[in-house]
Amino acid sequence: MVNLVLYRKYRPKTFNEVIGQEHVVQTLTNAIGNELISHAYLFSGPRGTGKTTLGRLLAKAVNCKNRKAGEYEPCNQCENCLEINQGNSMDLIEIDAASNRGIDDIRELKDGIKFIPSKAKYKVFIIDEAHQLSKDAANALLKTLEEPPSHAIFVLATTEIHKMIPTIISRCQRFDFRKLRIEEIIKRLELILEKEKIKVEKPALQLIASQAEGSIRDAESLLDEVISFSGESQPIKKEVIEKLLGIVEVKVIFQFLEYLVSKNAKMAISFLNKTLERGLSPHQFNKALIDYLREILLLKIDSELENPLILGLTEEEKEKLKEFAFKTPIEDIQEALQKFVETENQIKYSSIPQLPMELAIVEICEKTE
């Protein structure tokens, strides 16, 4: 049903297909259309938001043989475009700095820069996870950025710009990528599903989008996994995704919150342990609890808020969440949220993983009496 992984199969081939990074796309396309190409770009932002994709699009656009003056989109038909799309262009060099971080790797790169492009106008170097370069390697790269050959373009991509040396940052045009919104991810997934002729229920799609945490690549990878897990069973339901990812069911969280809000420590602890016996880890349960308590806190402040978690709920579940927000004092919500946030770290080091949660339950129930 699906031959290539979805995030590769549907990787944008034009700037107009890129979602969520309009500010970056507009600046780059203006520069390409006006032939104002910089020798070095720095793409910073969360994983899976399009940094490498835009680096490849830039490489295609500047080297496209059919692109006319004033245009910015690659044709995707000429020899240079096709080779980049297929991943076998001699003039697009991609380097993973996580595994090629030493000074010898950068020296090898510097030696390669001296040679003119084999077919294209520019030789484009994409250095992914650039913050992982060693100090010596970063300094060696800096010298190249200071005096680059006219045929070379560098695209440095990083998820942790604070680890980059300031002198490298200052020599690049910097673009900050943002996390994608839930609705942007859903729109993209719907387009893919339409082309793949696969049906997924809306709540299931919303859950996938919220679990991706702003990363379109993570969303597409998760969708791929869900399709494989579901087989021929369609439409794919929300429950399938919850089972696959080990997500705590909403009704389980709501029942636990009922005991917590009513200050029934005995029932809350008993329910917690019975739930964990079914295979959930304390970490999974605690994380889900934090997510829902945060949502209740935000609803207490503004009942009209539409956060990612809310979008994945049914109308009945939304009303239940609002009911918790309405009947629970804000001080109690804050107290519970703070305790379970502290518990998150304690679980990792506890010889009895659920013990920190049990202690938090007792403390919350006693304090709110």
Regions found by a protein language model. Give the residues of each.
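P-loop/Walker A NTP-binding region and its immediately flanking N-terminal helices
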Residues: M1-R174, E184, I192
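Extended, largely alpha-helical regulatory/partner-binding modules appended to the mid-to-C-terminal parts
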Residues: Q86-M90, E108, K121, Q173-R174, ...
